[in-house]
């Protein structure tokens, strides 16, 4: 179910095999009683309630040169300061993609300036008190060999209209 409040996004998508590996981890977490994660695995470049067309144009200009890209899992990160938290894999990538993503983010009036924290969300809207157990379970369910992720497609995704525009790769 997609909330009508979901923002427009510029996203990076993984190959099917890696998406499947992540969905298997989601399944294992759900079997342990944690909230079901229905989101398609992705890495967000930037988002806005309504994306400025200039930002999409810039992404279409910059991303083809840096996609496909490799990301390394370098740890876990927890977002949020209120009761519900988001747990994600913290990622590192090439300087070239990092620079492009920061330019795209800086061009987004709704963005956070030239900041980008590459991550892949593994748990949305988790109660604060469940985060420790969630991280432990996530580590137990994730193969130690699953260290790299590949971004093979960049797209502009509009949840309200379910429209996906491929900007690079794909």
Question: Which residue stretches match the model-derived regions?
Answer:
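Short strand-loop-strand
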Residues: 81-84, 119
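A structured binding-face within diverse protein domains that lines the active/interaction site
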Residues: 85, 89
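Basic, often amphipathic N-terminal segments
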Residues: 1-72, 91-150, 163-170
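Glycine-rich beta-strand-turn "strand-cap" elements at beta-sheet edges
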Residues: 77-82, 151-163
């Amino acid at each position: 179910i997609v909330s009508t409040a979901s923002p427009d996004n510029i996203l990076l998508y993984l190959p099917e095999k890696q998406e499947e590996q992540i969905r298997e981890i989601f399944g294992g977490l759900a079997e342990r009683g944690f909230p079901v994660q229905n989101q398609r695995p992705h890495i967000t470049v930037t988002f806005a309630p309504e994306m400025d067309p200039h930002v999409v144009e810039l992404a279409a200009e910059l991303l083809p040169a840096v996609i496909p890209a490799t990301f390394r899992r370098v740890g876990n990160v927890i977002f949020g300061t209120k009761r519900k938290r988001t747990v994600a894999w913290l990622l590192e990538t090439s300087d070239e993609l990092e620079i492009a993503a920061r330019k795209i983010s800086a061009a987004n009036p709704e963005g956070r300036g030239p900041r980008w924290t590459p991550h892949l969300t593994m748990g949305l809207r988790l109660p604060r008190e469940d985060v420790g157990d969630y991280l432990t379970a996530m580590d137990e369910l994730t193969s130690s060999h699953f260290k790299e992720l590949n971004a093979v497609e960049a797209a502009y995704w509009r949840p309200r209209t379910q429209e996906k525009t491929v900007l690079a790769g794909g």
